Amino acid sequence: MNIPQLVERKFLFASDQPITAPLYEIVIAQNGVFKRARRREMQAVVELSAFAVKIPELAAGEARVELTEKIPASVLEEILAHARSETDAANFTENLYAVCRDTETGNYFWKEVSRSRSFGSTIACDDDSAYQTAVLEIHTHPPGCREFSNQDDCDERGKFRLFGILVDIHSDNPAIRLRVGIYDSFWEIPAEFITDAPPENLTDLVKQEKERLAEICNDLGDDAPEYILAEEYRAATVNLSYVENL
């Protein structure tokens, strides 16, 4: 029996080189090491390591998320409304949702998939087909908890999908944080990467932070490259270990 190789390791010779691995692939590019994966609804590339010294014979890689069809912003707005109605501010409990794409119509739909709920956690109905095939897995967080938790990292391992948290859902300024996960490698992304429009009444935390970082770099002026080079130097020390372990 011919057993397919689920994980592939390769060099990137063209920027449009197709993703062929059934599970995921590790790619050495001109500018770093990347993990790439694809499924029916999307393909994604996450940077694992940036090279301080480029490899001119190879093509440059770039982190990205591309959906076959972007998720309507209204889906996230509906989930927020449902989350607000299912719990009140005084007795908050987390809730979990799966966003899926219908294989026949191509339309997106969402479903609540919590098996149990408490103030600081929610457990999924992992036998639910919506949870198993979700493009986006998103859950609510207690007020003020604006980062993915260590428990989130554990729960979201071993999957290739989008992940999200909704925070401060009963406040005047509810917020959302999104990321893509490729089998234990995560990259936070702004909502505009995956939605057809900015979700109304939701602060995009990743976009907000990126804009703030751009402002800081602009304020640094000529000193900004020194900070960037220092970060590249720090990252360069781990380049060899990534390559040796491929």
Residue ranges and their predicted role:
Residues M1-L136, P143-L246:
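Conserved beta-strand-loop surface patch within small alpha/beta domains used
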